[in-house]
């Protein structure tokens, strides 16, 4: 009896000595479905609960700056590198362990200068086209060539998309400011703007326009839902280092976090094999961890022949926004 009591007391002491894991709050600028899938997988693996506060990345970055040290957020998960760059420049992000950053480090994958955010998954800028009107041979070799009279009222674009803004940055870096502004003015004059990538995709599917500049995963989700054999559209990857660039989603831990250990575990989980599998099982994003393969049968990133561009900075984002204004798109 005394032995049983002794063991019970020992177990109680060990339990008391083990600190409870804190729940974490994630300010989420990623698509909610994908973020929720990863959060649920993380909770199952660790027991740490995750509260998602979802909104646009820029909006959340502004909120974090305003909240400062009082922010309840532990992690910022953004689809836009410029939003992360804004917080990094304000010294609001906590450096991440090299082991986390190295999980997704590879050729062409942007790396934070201060090592305070990590690239997690990729999306490719693509041209979705109507197969009833066009074949691959009818498509342009460069995304810049869609902003021409040949494509008047035939090409769609989404000027409010964060990925579109980063594509402008890529064009400036690779081709120069004049080329970027010419491209924007051409799209403004000859193209048709849409409020969302999904709306632009549907416009091509419905035959309203011949093609549109979108992100790859919108089409993959649509094709999976409808059945590839039942849709009229396909994707064209521009390739050969054209500014149809790979864009990354990223995650970061905030310096103001009261639960840094748990927050860093979450970001490490996102970059690791289990988190990457959970994310890419529900969205057609490119896993950046080399040990994970997408369930959407995506081409390997290397075959996309994406251009090598550095991570977008705050000043580059602001410059791209000014070009949008000059072109009359804002």
Curated annotation (Swiss-Prot):
A GO BP annotation: transmembrane transport
Binding-site residues, Fe cation: 31, 79, 217-218
Signal peptide: 1-22
GO cellular component terms listed in the entry, alphabetical order: outer membrane-bounded periplasmic space
Superkingdom of the organism of origin: Bacteria
Protein name: Major ferric iron-binding protein
Anything else known: Iron co-purifies with FBP and is bound by the protein as a Fe(3+) ion at an approximate molar ratio of 1:1.
Induction info: By iron deprivation.
Cell location: Periplasm
InterPro entries assigned to the protein according to its UniProt record, in alphabetical order: Ferric-bd, SBP, SBP_1_CS
Stated family: Belongs to the bacterial solute-binding protein 1 family.
PROSITE patterns, per database record: SBP_BACTERIAL_1 (PS01037)
GO molecular function terms attached to this record: metal ion binding
Gene for this chain: fbp
Function noted in UniProt: This protein may be a central component in the iron-acquisition system.
């Amino acid at each position: 009896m005394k032995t049983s009591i002794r063991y019970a007391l020992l177990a109680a002491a060990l339990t008391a000595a083990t600190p409870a894991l804190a729940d974490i709050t994630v300010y989420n600028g990623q698509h909610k479905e994908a973020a929720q899938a990863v959060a649920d997988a993380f909770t199952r693996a660790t027991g740490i609960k995750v509260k998602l506060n979802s909104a646009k990345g820029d909006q959340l970055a502004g909120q974090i700056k305003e909240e400062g040290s009082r922010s309840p957020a532990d992690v910022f998960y953004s689809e836009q590198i410029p939003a992360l760059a804004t917080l990094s420049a304000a010294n609001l992000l906590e450096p991440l362990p090299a082991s986390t950053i190295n999980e997704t480090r590879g050729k062409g994958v942007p790396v934070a200068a201060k090592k305070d955010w990590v690239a997690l998954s990729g999306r490719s800028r693509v041209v979705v086209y109507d197969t009833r009107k066009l074949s691959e041979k009818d498509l342009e070799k460069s995304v810049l060539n869609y902003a021409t009279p040949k494509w008047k009222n035939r090409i769609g674009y989404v000027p409010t998309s964060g990925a579109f803004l980063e594509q402008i940055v890529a064009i400036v870096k690779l081709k120069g400011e004049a080329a970027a502004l010419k491209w924007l003015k051409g799209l403004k004059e000859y193209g048709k703007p849409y409020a969302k990538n999904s709306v632009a995709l549907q416009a091509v599917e419905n035959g309203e326009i011949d093609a549109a500049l979108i992100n790859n995963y919108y089409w993959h989700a649509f094709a999976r839902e409808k059945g590839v054999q039942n849709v009229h559209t396909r994707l064209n990857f521009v390739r050969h280092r054209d500014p149809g660039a790979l864009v990354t989603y990223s995650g970061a831990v905030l310096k103001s976090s009261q639960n840094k250990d748990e927050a860093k575990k979450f970001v490490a989980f996102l970059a690791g094999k289990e988190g990457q599998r959970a994310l890419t099982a529900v969205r057609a994003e490119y896993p950046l961890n080399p040990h994970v393969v997408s369930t959407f049968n995506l081409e390997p990133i290397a075959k996309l022949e994406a251009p090598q561009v550095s991570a977008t900075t705050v000043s580059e984002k602001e410059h791209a926004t000014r070009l949008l204004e000059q072109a009359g798109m804002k």
